[in-house]
């Protein structure tokens, strides 16, 4: 039976509608391998604003957006043993893939798949945790399947790789704290040559473009001139790869359907968060409280942020 809840959502009432309309939403019951979460914080991703303003993905309107959730379990599905009501959790809401309203983040209560959710230690706030899911899932998708960069660095280091990355000079110390062994200025006119030189004598396991379009040609140039696997995963598709280099677009929701989701959210992340070996990143920029603040937060994200991710407290 459905939990006794009063749900509400920031609704996208029709294609390209602005602003979101905050009003009542259905109550949900978790099925097998699902949990119902009372959301305490949600984060904003670039895809949210582009879905609202450009309507490039097929959706059934009215609909709800959002993928990053941190909150408290209020009900578990019939076969769920890993979670209990009252548990603090962080998880990836995968409604963009399932097209189910209950699987989206911008509402008071969300259904999460158990293989896309992790227990959250009490010392990590909901707001700090909410920055993780989509970036983490996308990084895992790019690294282990055939705001992403922060997670890709940490996952790459955890998997035993030496990580080279690019950033603006003001963020050099930040990405080194995440585990990058060498950092290069992406504004430099010689950044590609500098990376190729630094990789001499090393075997490249692959590259991940966490920006898309503008960064893809440079990333491809570097791997094409280096020894090792000439493979680039990118968060945006449409790039025509040159001969000898494979470019594949990735999206985080795909890990819900294979062993990677469980490996990240069940086997790795809970222990890493508790031990402090994985840091929620980038830094949460809290833009408001309540579902009424979601539109302003999406608009703020669209203006651009550096080493920060826009979050709304609920």
UniProtKB/Swiss-Prot annotation:
UniProt xrefs under InterPro entries: ADH-like_C, ADH-like_N, GroES-like_sf, NAD(P)-bd_dom_sf, PKS_ER, Trans-enoyl_RdTase-like
GO CC terms of this entry: cytosol
EC main group: oxidoreductase
Its EC number(s): 1.-.-.-
One function term, GO molecular function aspect: NADPH binding
Pfam families in UniProt: ADH_N, ADH_zinc_N
Top-rank lineage group of the source organism: Eukaryota
Induction pattern: Induced by the antibiotic concanamycin A. Down-regulated when grown with elevated levels of potassium chloride.
UniProtKB keywords: Oxidoreductase, Stress response
Family: Belongs to the zinc-containing alcohol dehydrogenase family.
Its biological purpose: Involved in osmoadaptation.
Name of the protein in its database record: Zinc-binding alcohol dehydrogenase domain-containing protein cipB
Source organism of the structure: Emericella nidulans (strain FGSC A4 / ATCC 38163 / CBS 112.46 / NRRL 194 / M139) (Aspergillus nidulans)
Protein's gene: cipB
């Amino acid at each position: 039976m459905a939990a006794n809840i009063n749900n509400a959502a920031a609704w996208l009432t029709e294609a390209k509608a602005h602003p979101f309309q905050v009003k009542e939403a259905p109550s949900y019951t978790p099925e097998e391998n699902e949990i119902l979460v009372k959301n305490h914080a949600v984060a904003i991703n670039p895809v949210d604003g582009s879905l609202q303003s450009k309507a490039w993905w097929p959706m059934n309107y009215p609909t709800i957006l959002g993928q990053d959730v941190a909150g408290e379990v209020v009900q578990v599905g019939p076969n769920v043993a890993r979670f209990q009501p009252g548990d603090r959790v962080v998880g990836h809401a995968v409604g963009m893939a399932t097209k189910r309203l209950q699987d989206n983040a911008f509402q008071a209560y969300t259904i999460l798949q158990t293989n896309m959710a992790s227990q959250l230690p009490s010392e990590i706030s909901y707001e700090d945790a909410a920055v993780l899911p989509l970036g983490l899932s996308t990084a895992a998708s790019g690294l282990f399947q055939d705001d992403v960069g922060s997670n890709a660095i940490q996952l790459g280091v955890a998997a035993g790789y030496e990580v080279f990355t690019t950033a603006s000079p003001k963020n050099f110390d930040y990405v080194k704290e995440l585990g990058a062994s060498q950092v290069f200025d992406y504004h430099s006119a010689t950044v590609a040559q500098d990376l190729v030189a630094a990789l001499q004598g090393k075997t490249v396991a692959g590259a991940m473009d966490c920006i898309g379009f503008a960064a893809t040609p440079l990333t491809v140039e570097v791997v094409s001139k280096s020894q090792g696997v000439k493979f680039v995963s990118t968060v945006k598709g449409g790039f025509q790869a040159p001969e000898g280099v494979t470019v594949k677009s990735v999206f985080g929701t795909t890990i819900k359907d294979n062993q990677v989701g469980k490996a990240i959210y069940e086997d790795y992340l809970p222990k890493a968060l508790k031990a402090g070996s994985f840091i929620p990143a980038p830094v949460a920029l809290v833009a408001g409280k309540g579902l009424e603040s979601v539109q302003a937060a999406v608009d703020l994200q669209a203006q651009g942020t550096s080493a920060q991710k826009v979050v709304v407290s609920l």
